[in-house]
Amino acid sequence: MTEQTSEATVVNNSPAPTIPKIKREKPTPEEIEERRKLKQLEVVPEGFSRKQWKRELKKQRWQDTKQEYLEVQREKKRLARQRKRERLKDLDENDELRKAQPIPSRQISTNNVSVIIDCDFDELMHEKEIVSLSNQIKACYSAMRHCTYKLPIQITSFNKRLKQRFEAQLHDYHLWQGNISFTDRSLTEYVTGAPNSESKDNDGNSNSNTTNSTDTINTENLVYLTADTDEEITKLEPNHTYIIGGIVDKNRHKQLCYNKAKELGIKVARLPIGKYIEMNGRHVLVTSHVYELLCKWFENDGDWETAFNKVLPPRKIKSKSPS
């Protein structure tokens, strides 16, 4: 019996595979000084400031090393999967470690609540802000995959630099699964019924889950979320679509989304941030946080405070009881 017990508790102690680190020698003070002198002598092309040229060189270096970086990241992920398989292969199916890794439910909200990300602000953003917005949309997709309640997303005004960014750097968005779609039509065109090219899903096909070129949206069921209003939402209404402004501008453009909503006859409202958390400055959240908060509201049975604390980084919030 003793021998059998010892055999049953054998654990694979073989060392985990690792990626050899590339050792780079630190430059000497003389080399650093030489580099500094070369930078001072460097000729900045016409039309560039020194700062802009430095940024351009950095972008070129990234393009030169991008493939190597991606290969290292893929290898890290492969090794992580391998380590996970080794940890789990000798464990029983009822082991606590397996129980601690549930697969998220594929349930979609039955209340017909959906989300539009209005990206019709391309000309108001700098290049870095376009990159940031594209990453936030990617974060929305990640939240959709992992949340229990997956609110459908439609990205409107998917064109210009934003689309170019996706096609160049995030081209696998065509393979995204779930109820997320992209259209070059603007929110204004949907509301007014102005014709444009047909909405496409991530496979480039006509998307039956979104309005086509002749459809309009009933503004009675639209709510534009903006911090520039005193009207707060207390719950997410069934059969309503909540619009998130797809813009990264460091608050340069005040009341931008508010004014657009008023022009289109769309109701405006803000999330009840002040009732549950305290934030420094204006109560403005990034696009991906707003989307995830809406999903978490359903997941936590309408508990805004729990949703805020689950989504926002602890360093940015301070719990506050409802008044």
Curated annotation (Swiss-Prot):
Instruction: Domain (SAM-dependent MTase TRM10-type): give its ranges.
Output: 99-319
Q: Which reaction does it catalyse?
A: guanosine(9) in tRNA + S-adenosyl-L-methionine = N(1)-methylguanosine(9) in tRNA + S-adenosyl-L-homocysteine + H(+)
May I have one GO cellular component term?
A: cytoplasm
Instruction: Show the ranges annotated as biased composition (Polar residues).
Output: 1-16
**InterPro entries, A to Z:** MT_TRM10-typ, MT_TRM10-typ_sf, TRM10/TRM10A, tRNA_m1G_MeTrfase_euk, tRNA_MeTrfase_TRMD/TRM10
- Which molecular-function annotations from GO does this UniProt entry contain? tRNA (guanosine(9)-N1)-methyltransferase activity; tRNA binding
State its Enzyme Commission number(s).
2.1.1.221
UniProt: S-adenosyl-L-methionine binding residues: 225-226, 245, 249-253, 257, 271, 283-285
Q: Where is the composition biased (Low complexity)?
A: 204-215
**Disordered: region residues:** 1-34, 192-215
Q: Where is the active site?
A: 249 (proton acceptor)
Q: Which pairs are disulfide-linked?
A: none
Q: What does this protein do?
A: S-adenosyl-L-methionine-dependent guanine N(1)-methyltransferase that catalyzes the formation of N(1)-methylguanine at position 9 (m1G9) in cytoplasmic tRNA.
* Family recorded in the similarity comment: Belongs to the class IV-like SAM-binding methyltransferase superfamily. TRM10 family.
Q: How does it assemble?
A: Monomer.
What protein am I looking at? tRNA (guanine(9)-N1)-methyltransferase
Q: Which organism is it from?
A: Candida albicans (strain SC5314 / ATCC MYA-2876)
Gene that encodes it: TRM10
